[in-house]
UniProtKB/Swiss-Prot annotation:
This is Chaperonin GroEL. It comes from Legionella pneumophila. Forms a cylinder of 14 subunits composed of two heptameric rings stacked back-to-back. Interacts with the co-chaperonin GroES. It catalyses: ATP + H2O + a folded polypeptide = ADP + phosphate + an unfolded polypeptide. The keyword Ligase does not apply. PROSITE patterns: CHAPERONINS_CPN60 (PS00296). GO terms for cellular component: cytoplasm. The keyword 4Fe-4S does not apply. Keywords: ATP-binding, Chaperone, Cytoplasm, Isomerase, Nucleotide-binding, Stress response. ATP binds at residues 29-32, 50, 86-90, 414, 478-480, 494. The gene is groEL.
Length: 548
């Protein structure tokens, strides 16, 4: 395949054109007065969004060199979204600003490598300053404020996320689903829940809810299929004498064993329910072990030399209450020791650090949440499907932002934290003039998020930035109301992690682009038209008339 090459300033200008076009589309969504962007879909209604990364992902240019620039900035937005969950527009605006200022310096004859070194030094200083300014985000009010800002000033979303976090804890799993009504709803599942229901409907003892409810039951955990009742006789006799109910969690219960359990349950000899173990393969073994630790039981597995025939009441777990429906089993208040549960959580966390698969990490996080006690489901309500998609994306953004805030703390929002962090650059000096220029490029660039927020709100950016820079601490400009004041008191907060990741990712890609000296792309293919004259040979088919 033939290639096209561009060098030096020509290459950088082409990249800059792509970056500018992408940033122009993304930056209109920034801040409380940001505008919507409508995205065409190949099927169905168009999507309306105010989410920077959604806009960035849709953009692709026909011009290959422009597209390369745009794709690199798209990577900034995606990486910031993946690691911090928010701050995609901030990252895009910062990357464009660093690149524009840097390109002017390179065009004036400065050394791109020294500019990059200066920018890197400045980013390090600003990051340290941001972390020093950061305050821990502990109370529900602060969590709600972070969620509200990230959800484009929708207080209902901020409040429901704060409520969910309060109920399931910082480690709990919060999932977002489509609702059926117009209002957002929150459902909280206390205790450990897994997606397996009763094997037979004959175990139901609450006809009203179509569920099986067991009070203070024993729990038998078996890592194999159970088909013979003989294996379980000693355990069943012990349970019958105790007068307590029994929940059996096994790979499967079938045939004679299932029939006998159903008959005993219906006659009232042993109150019992059987469910299949959650998960598959190694994950099933791990989840059975989780349940064992949560309920102070023992998994009956031939791998560790324990047989079902030799099982005793000491091997069984216990819980305060268990509810089994057609699709789910919920274990409430397992009797496991807190120290053992915490050790298990720490062990799973260590696995999360090591895994490279996002899917595995998500499943491990779910196991942590189930052990820590709680899963919350936010059902998003909306009038139309278009609104539902847009609102659901905002709830997910806000959820990521609040998690980031809990992790690394919060700083004043609205671009104020970056303006305050400029102080860290006052005493910073590079090894030469070109590095000093790199530091100054970043000094100007970190004003750009506030400038864009103010511009989108219809105010004069330079006036606002200068006024905010004259003051100290959390003093800033509320673009939603047009008022100046303490940003923290007004509830305008940003997670430190989001601001930090946006700056680091933007500077990383922008300085890479500044040091680009050559670009290589495929030449566009020339479309070869099919000659219509070739069809002339078909005329010979006229002789087929004789076939009639």
């Amino acid at each position: 395949m033939a290639k096209e090459l561009r060098f030096g300033d020509d290459a950088r200008l082409q990249m800059l054109a792509g970056v500018n076009a992408l940033a122009d589309a993304v930056q209109v969504t920034m801040g409380p007065r940001g505008r919507n962007v409508v995205l065409e879909k190949s099927y169905g209604a168009p999507t309306v969004t105010k989410d920077g990364v959604s806009v960035a992902k849709e953009i692709e240019f026909e011009h290959r060199f422009m597209n390369m620039g745009a794709q690199m900035v798209k990577e900034v937005a995606s990486k910031t979204s993946d690691t911090a969950g928010d701050g995609t527009t901030t990252a895009t605006v910062l990357a464009r600003s660093i690149l524009v200022e840097g390109h002017k310096a390179v065009a004036a004859g400065m050394n791109p490598m020294d500019l990059k070194r200066g920018i890197d030094k400045a980013v390090l200083a600003v990051t340290k300053k941001l972390q020093a300014m950061s305050k821990p985000c502990k109370d529900s009010k602060a969590i709600a404020q972070v969620g509200t800002i990230s959800a484009n000033s929708d207080e209902a979303i901020g409040a429901i996320i704060a409520e969910a976090m309060e109920k399931v804890g910082k480690e709990g799993v919060i999932t977002v689903e489509d609702g059926n009504g117009l209002e957002n709803e929150l459902y909280v599942v206390e205790g450990m829940q897994f997606d397996r229901g009763y094997i037979s409907p004959y175990f139901i003892n609450n006809q009203q809810n179509m569920s099986c409810e067991l009070e203070h039951p024993f729990i038998l955990l078996v890592d194999k299929k159970v088909s013979s009742i003989r294996e379980m006789l000693s355990v069943l006799e012990g349970v019958a004498k105790s007068g307590r109910p029994l929940l059996i969690i096994a790979e499967d219960v079938e045939g004679e064993a299932l029939a006998t359990l159903v008959v005993n349950n219906m006659r009232g000899i042993v109150k019992v329910c059987a469910v299949k173990a959650p998960g598959f393969g190694d994950r099933r073994k791990a989840m059975l072990q989780d349940i064992a630790i949560l309920t102070k039981g023992q998994v009956i597995s031939e791998e560790i030399g324990k047989s079902l025939e030799g099982a005793t009441l000491e091997d069984l777990g216990s819980a305060k209450r268990i509810v089994v429906t057609k699709e789910n089993t919920t274990i409430i208040d397992g009797e496991g020791k807190a120290t053992e549960i915490n050790a298990r959580i720490a062990q799973i966390r260590a696995q999360m650090e090591e895994t490279t698969s996002d899917y595995d990490r998500e499943k491990l996080q779910e196991r942590v949440a189930k052990l820590a006690g709680g899963v919350a489901v936010i059902k998003v309500g909306a009038a139309t499907e278009v609104e539902m998609k847009e609102k659901k994306a905002r709830v997910e953004d806000a959820l990521h932002a609040t998690r980031a805030a809990v992790e690394e703390g919060i700083v004043a929002g609205g671009g104020v934290a970056l303006i305050r962090a400029q102080k860290a650059l006052d005493s910073l000096k590079g090894d030469n003039d070109d590095q000093n220029m790199g530091i100054n490029i970043l000094r100007r660039a970190i004003e750009s998020p506030m400038r864009q927020i103010v511009t989108n709100a219809g105010y004069e950016a330079s006036v606002v930035v200068n006024k905010v820079a004259e003051h100290k601490d959390n003093y800033g400009f509320n673009a939603a109301t047009g008022e100046y004041g303490d940003m923290v008191e007004m509830g305008i907060l940003d997670p430190t992690k989001v601001t930090r990741m946006a700056l680091q990712n933007a500077a990383s890609v922008a300085s890479l682009m500044l040091t680009t000296e050559c670009m290589v792309a495929d030449l566009p293919k020339k479309e070869e038209g099919v000659g219509a004259g070739d069809m002339g040979g078909m005329g010979g088919m006229g002789g087929m008339g004789g076939m009639m």
